[in-house]
Amino acid sequence: MKQIKVIPCLDVKEGRVVKGVNFVNLRDARDPVEAAEAYCRQGADELVFLDIMATVENRRTRMEWVKKVAQMVTIPFAVGGGIGSIADMEELFAMGVGKASINTAVVKNPALISEAAAKFGKERIVVAIDGRKNAEGSGLPRLEVVVKSGEESTGKDIVTWAREVESSGAGEILLTSKDADGTKAGYDLEMTRAVAEAVSIPVTASGGAGTLEHLYQGVVEGKASAVLAASIFHFGEITIPEAKKYLSERGIPVRL
C-alpha cells in the first residue's frame, strides 16, 4: 500500500471557511489563511480550497481569496469551485496552486479534461465528483453524479463517469458523498469503494468523516488513496497529527 494522504478541506464562502451538512446549513469555522497556516504546521499532506458558491452563482473562483492562501502554503494545494476553462487554470497555476479541481464544467464539457491534461500534465488535474444514492425504482442510477453543489441531477452513473474521466486524462478523483457530507456519520464506503475499484488513479474519500475510525474505514473498506475531512479538523475535534498517528498504529502507511 502506498502512503495514504490526510487532507483538510477549506470550504470557502464570502472569504470565510464554512461547514454545513449535505452542502447546506453552513456555519462559520475560521479565516482561510489562518486555517491553511495551521494545517501546514500540523503536517497535512495537501490542502484543498473550494469556493463553494462559485458554480451555484455562475461565477469564476474568487482569485483574491485563493491568492492569500497560495502565498503562504508550504504543502501541495488544490483549488476547486468555478473553474471552467484553461484560462482559469493558467491563472491559478501562476499563483502557485498545484492542482485544479474541476467538477460541473467537465460534466457539461468532458473534453476539457483531456485538453487540460495535455496542456498542464495529468498530475495537476483533479476531477471532483459529487455523488448521491437514489432509491430503487427512481429511474435514476443508484449511485448518481450531481453538480452545482449537489443541487442538480445529471442522470450519470458515478462508476461510468469515473472511468470516463480517467480515460480522458484526469490524474485523480476527489469523491464526495452529498448524502454523507457534514454528517460525521462516516464516508459512503459503498460509493467510495465502487469508484476506487473501477479506476487505477488515486481516489480521495470525502464527505462524512467524524471519527478516527472513519478515516481508517475510508482506506481499508473504501479503498481510498487519501482521506479528506473538514468539520473534525476545523473545530479541533481531531488534529492532523492525531489522525496520522491513529492510521499509522492501525498499519496504514502515512507521512509522520
Task: Enumerate the predicted regions with their spans.
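Conserved, mostly hydrophobic/aromatic
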Residues: 11, 39, 47, 92, ...
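Structural preference for beta-strand elements that scaffold enzyme active sites
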Residues: 5-9, 46, 74-78, 98-101, ...
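Glycine-rich, proline-tolerant flexible connector loops at the mouths of alpha/beta enzymes
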Residues: 46-65, 104, 174-186
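Conserved anion-binding
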Residues: 12-14, 18-19, 97-175, 179-180, ...
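Glycine-rich phosphate-binding active-site loops on the catalytic face of alpha/beta enzymes
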Residues: 91-112, 177-182, 207-211, 217-241
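Catalytic cores of alpha/beta
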Residues: 73, 77-78, 83-96, 190-227
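Charged helix-capping and loop-helix junction motifs
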Residues: 60-67, 110, 155-159, 185-194
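Glycine/small-residue-rich loop that forms an oxyanion/phosphate-binding "nest" at active or ligand-binding sites
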Residues: 53, 62-120
